[in-house]
Amino acid sequence: MNRLLIIDGLNLVRRIHAALPDEGDMDTLYDRVAQACRKLLRGHQPTHCAIVWDGDAISWRKHLYEDYKKGRKPMPEALAKGLPALKTKLETLDVHSVNADSEADDIIATLACKLAATGGEAIIVSTDKGLLQLMSPHIRQWDHFAGQFFDIEAFEAKLGIERHQLLDYIALCGDSGNKIPGIPGIGPKSASELLRTYRSLANLYHSLGTLGSRQANKLREGRDMARLSYKLAKLQTELPLHLKLSDLRVNPS
């Protein structure tokens, strides 16, 4: 069975870089990133491996909603300068770079879903909880820094929803980390309670007459924001990749 290890490049590198005593020490950064990659390869024994990098183009999500990810800290200058050399060095480790035009998430999602559709296993290495919408028997998410797979049941319990309701949940209450707005006046607690009762966003909107007038009005007036938020949160899984699985093969030696 094919097993594809998909590393969220900047998610890994920026966290390692943030822990360095000297942010300009690119040699130490490379050593630590290389050490992390070797550990991931040893631990998961993939047949194929890709490290996916964010690109510089403005995301389609930003074009759709100007405030998307507004306020995010820019990449430190030293890291931005050293990143091209770091990518080149990593190629010697059987970690094959895949460069996205803008956000890496949609490329990660496409790679994972295409492999899962053939019966293979995809392991995504990232702490980005937005990727949890992809989880299935064939797709799992590994937190390198915690040294464990994400506990989906604990995540569901924390939010008070089931995994398949994640996008509907974000449509209702938004995602503050990515500046996805949600519906004004609907918070996480209300969102989880509504989904527990009505099971889906579609059912909820078909049942507005069963709600109190105040909450029904919020939902009615916020319908467009819910649609927008759902679209912003949903990962694309059918992007053209311009590569073959064999391009990502790990040297068995």
From Swiss-Prot:
Recorded family membership: Belongs to the Xni family.
The keyword Heme is annotated on this UniProt entry: no
Binding site for K(+): 172, 181, 183, 186
NCBIfam families: PRK09482.1
UniProt keyword list: DNA-binding, Endonuclease, Hydrolase, Magnesium, Metal-binding, Nuclease, Potassium
GO biological process, one term: DNA replication, Okazaki fragment processing
InterPro entries listed in its UniProt record: 5-3_exonucl_a-hlix_arch_N (IPR020046), 5-3_exonuclease (IPR002421), 5-3_exonuclease_C_sf (IPR036279), DNA_polI_H3TH (IPR020045), FEN (IPR038969), HhH2 (IPR008918), PIN-like_dom_sf (IPR029060), Xni (IPR022895)
Lineage of the species this protein comes from: Bacteria, Pseudomonadati, Pseudomonadota, Gammaproteobacteria, Alteromonadales
Top-rank taxon: Bacteria
CDD domains given in the database record: H3TH_53EXO, PIN_53EXO
The keyword Nuclease is annotated on this UniProt entry: yes
Region (Interaction with DNA), start-end ranges: 185-190
EC nos: 3.1.-.-
Gene source species: Shewanella amazonensis (strain ATCC BAA-1098 / SB2B)
UniProt gene name: xni
Annotated Gene3D superfamilies: 5' to 3' exonuclease, C-terminal subdomain (1.10.150.20), 5'-nuclease (3.40.50.1010)
Described purpose of this protein according to its UniProt entry: Has flap endonuclease activity. During DNA replication, flap endonucleases cleave the 5'-overhanging flap structure that is generated by displacement synthesis when DNA polymerase encounters the 5'-end of a downstream Okazaki fragment.
GO molecular function (one): 5'-flap endonuclease activity
A Pfam family of this chain: 5_3_exonuc
Name recorded for this polypeptide: Flap endonuclease Xni
Span of domain 5'-3' exonuclease: 162-251
Binding site for Mg(2+): 105
Cofactor, free-text remark: Binds 2 Mg(2+) per subunit. Only one magnesium ion has a direct interaction with the protein, the other interactions are indirect. Binds 1 K(+) per subunit. The potassium ion strongly increases the affinity for DNA.
Cofactor: Mg(2+); K(+)
